[in-house]
C-alpha cells in the first residue's frame, strides 16, 4: 500500500497481529506485576506518569475519546516504556516532555492521541501530589512508631516522681510519665496535622489541563479513582497554579512542628548533662554516648547531639518551600521540586527515628530524682495551696508565707524535710500580721511536713489531666487508642491507593484482546 494519508489511516486502524498480541500480553503482565508490588519508595515521577498514561488509555477508550482500534498499539507502547524504565539502571524520565518521546519511539505518533486535554501542568501537579501523599504516610508511620515508644515509656514511669522545670529552673514535682504524655500530646497534634494536610493533598488535578480545563469531555472523577485520590481539585486554576505551590509549604509546616517538638524534648534532657549527678541520662555506649579525646571523665551525649542536629536540618529544609514560594507569580516551579520536598519529609522521618533511639536509651534514676526534689523547694507552692483550700487563706498571703520559708531555708542551708516547724510558725505569723486572716499557722506539723512531700503532692492532684494515678490510667488508655486509630488510618489510606492501582492494572490489561 502506498504511503498516502488514507493508507496510513487504514494501517493505524488494523487490529494487532496475534504475534504482536502475545508480546504485548507478556509486557503487560510484567508491568502489572511490578506496579502491584511497587512500594511507595518506588513511586517516583516516572511511575506516576506511567499510571496516568495507563489510566488515560483505559478511560478514553471506554468513553470514545480514543479509537478502540488504536488502543492495543498505544497500550503496548505504554507497557514497553514502563517495562524498560523498570530495568536495573534504566533511564526513568520525570517529565511529560521527556517521557512522551519514549512513547512515540515505542508506538509511533498515534500514541500522542493520549494527550487529549492534558498538559504538563496538570500531570506534574498530579504526580507531585501523589508523591507527597506517599511521603506523608511514611512520615505518619514513623511518627506513630516514635509516639508509641513515648507512650509506653510514660506507662512504665507513671509513678516515677521527678522534678519538672520552667524557665530552666526546677519548678514542681511531677510524674515522669505525665511529663512524657505531655510531649505525646504534642506529637498527637502533629499526627492530626498530617491527616489534615493529607486530605488537602489527596486531590487529583488531572483534567484541569493548564489552568482553565479543556474542551475534551474528560472523566476527571474516574481518573482520580484510578490513581487513588479521594477528591478532585475543584478549581482548574487552583490545581496547578495555587494548590501545587501551597502543598509543599503545608507539609513543611508539619515537618517543622515535629522537629520543634523533638528539639524541645532533647534540649530538656540535654540540660541534665550540665549537672554533676543527673537523674536522667542516656545508657552509655551503643552509639548513645562517646568519650572525650582529652577528658577521661566525660561521656558526651552524642545521640542527643545528632538528634538535635537532625531536627535543625529538618527545620532548615522545611523553610525551603516557604522561601521559594515567596514573591513569585502563581504556578512557578520553585517550591514544587519533588526531590527537595521528599528530602524535607525524609529529614523529619530521620529526626523521629533518632528520637525513638533516645527514648529507648533513657535511664531514669528514681532515687536520685527524689533526692533532687527533696534538696530544693519545688513543693513549696503546695503550702499556699493547702492554706487556701483548707483554711481560706488567700493564695497571695499563703504565697508570701511559702516564699518566706524558702528564703529562710536557703539562707540557712535547710532542706525541705528538715525545716523547723517553729520557724514556719514564726514566718507565717509575720506574713499575716495585721490582716484579718488566722494569725497562727493553721497547719499542724504533720500536715506541714506532708505538704512538702513530692510523692504525696503528685498523688493528691485532683483535676482532670493531672498526674494522679486514675488520670494517668485514663490518659494512657486514650493515647494508646489514638495511636491505634492512626495506625488504622495509615493502613486504610495505603490500602485505598494500592487497591486503586490494582484496579487500573487489571483494566489496563484488558486493553488487548
Describe the predicted segments one by one.
Residues 1-19:
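N-terminal secretory signal peptides that target proteins for export/translocation
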Residues 20, 39-52, 106, 293-513:
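Glycine-rich cofactor/substrate-binding loops
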Residues 20, 34-203, 207-213, 218-224, ...:
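A helix-coil-helix interface module used to build multimeric assemblies
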Residues 25-33:
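Bacterial N-terminal signal peptides
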Residues 57-65, 178, 249-257, 382-392:
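Short, well-ordered beta-strand elements within core beta-sheets of diverse protein domains
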Residues 65-66, 278-280, 393, 415:
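Conserved hydrophobic residue
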Residues 85, 92, 150, 154-157, ...:
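Leucine-rich amphipathic alpha-helices with coiled-coil/heptad-repeat character
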Residues 128-133, 137-144, 148, 155, ...:
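Charged, flexible cofactor/metal-binding loops and thiol motifs
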Amino acid at each position: 500500500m502506498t504511503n498516502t494519508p488514507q493508507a496510513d489511516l487504514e494501517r493505524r486502524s488494523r487490529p494487532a497481529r496475534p504475534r504482536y498480541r502475545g508480546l504485548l500480553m507478556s509486557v503487560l503482565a510484567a508491568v502489572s506485576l511490578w506496579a502491584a508490588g511497587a512500594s511507595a519508595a518506588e513511586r517516583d515521577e516516572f511511575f506516576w506518569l506511567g499510571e496516568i498514561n495507563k489510566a488515560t488509555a483505559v478511560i478514553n477508550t471506554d468513553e470514545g475519546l480514543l479509537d478502540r482500534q488504536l488502543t492495543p498499539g498505544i497500550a503496548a507502547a505504554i507497557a514497553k516504556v514502563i517495562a524498560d524504565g523498570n530495568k536495573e539502571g534504566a533511564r526513568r524520565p520525570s517529565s511529560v516532555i521527556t517521557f512522551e518521546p519514549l512513547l512515540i519511539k515505542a508506538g509511533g505518533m498515534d500514541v500522542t492521541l493520549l494527550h487529549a486535554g492534558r498538559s504538563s501542568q496538570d500531570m506534574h501537579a498530579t504526580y507531585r501530589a501523589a508523591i507527597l501523599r506517599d511521603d506523608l504516610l511514611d512520615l505518619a508511620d514513623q511518627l506513630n512508631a516514635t509516639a508509641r515508644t513515648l507512650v509506653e515509656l510514660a506507662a512504665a514511669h507513671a509513678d516515677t516522681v521527678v522534678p519538672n522545670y520552667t524557665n530552666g529552673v526546677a519548678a514542681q514535682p511531677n510524674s515522669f510519665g505525665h511529663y512524657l504524655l505531655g510531649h505525646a500530646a504534642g506529637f498527637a497534634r502533629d499526627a492530626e496535622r498530617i491527616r489534615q494536610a493529607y486530605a488537602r493533598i489527596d486531590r487529583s488535578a488531572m483534567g484541569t489541563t493548564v489552568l482553565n480545563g479543556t474542551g475534551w469531555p474528560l472523566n476527571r472523577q474516574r481518573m482520580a479513582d484510578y490513581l487513588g485520590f479521594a477528591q478532585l481539585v475543584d478549581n482548574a486554576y487552583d490545581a496547578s497554579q495555587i494548590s501545587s505551590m501551597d502543598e509543599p509549604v503545608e507539609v513543611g509546616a508539619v515537618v517543622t512542628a515535629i522537629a520543634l517538638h523533638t528539639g524541645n524534648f532533647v534540649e530538656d534532657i540535654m540540660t541534665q548533662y550540665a549537672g554533676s549527678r543527673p537523674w536522667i541520662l542516656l545508657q552509655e555506649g551503643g552509639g548513645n554516648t562517646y568519650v572525650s579525646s582529652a577528658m577521661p571523665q566525660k561521656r558526651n551525649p552524642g545521640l542527643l547531639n545528632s538528634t538535635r542536629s537532625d531536627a535543625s536540618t529538618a527545620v532548615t529544609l522545611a523553610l525551603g518551600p516557604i522561601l521559594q514560594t515567596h514573591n513569585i507569580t502563581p504556578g512557578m516551579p520553585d517550591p514544587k521540586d519533588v526531590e527537595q520536598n521528599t528530602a524535607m519529609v525524609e529529614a523529619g522521618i530521620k529526626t523521629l527515628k533518632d528520637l525513638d533511639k533516645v527514648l529507648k536509651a533513657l535511664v531514669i534514676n528514681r532515687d536520685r530524682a527524689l533526692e533532687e526534689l527533696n534538696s530544693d523547694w519545688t513543693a513549696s507552692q503546695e503550702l499556699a495551696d493547702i492554706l487556701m483550700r483548707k483554711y481560706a487563706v488567700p493564695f497571695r498571703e499563703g504565697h508570701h508565707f511559702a516564699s518566706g520559708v524558702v528564703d529562710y531555708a536557703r539562707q540557712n542551708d535547710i532542706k525541705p524535710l528538715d525545716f523547723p516547724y517553729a520557724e514556719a510558725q514564726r514566718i507565717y505569723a509575720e506574713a499575716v500580721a495585721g490582716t484579718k486572716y488566722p494569725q497562727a499557722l493553721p497547719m499542724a506539723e504533720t500536715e506541714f511536713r506532708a505538704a512538702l512531700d513530692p510523692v504525696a503532692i503528685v498523688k493528691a492532684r485532683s483535676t482532670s489531666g493531672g498526674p494522679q494515678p486514675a488520670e494517668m490510667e485514663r490518659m494512657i488508655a486514650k493515647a494508646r487508642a489514638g495511636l491505634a486509630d492512626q495506625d488504622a488510618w495509615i493502613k486504610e489510606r495505603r490500602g485505598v491507593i494500592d487497591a486503586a492501582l490494582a484496579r487500573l492494572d487489571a483494566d489496563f490489561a484488558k486493553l488487548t484482546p
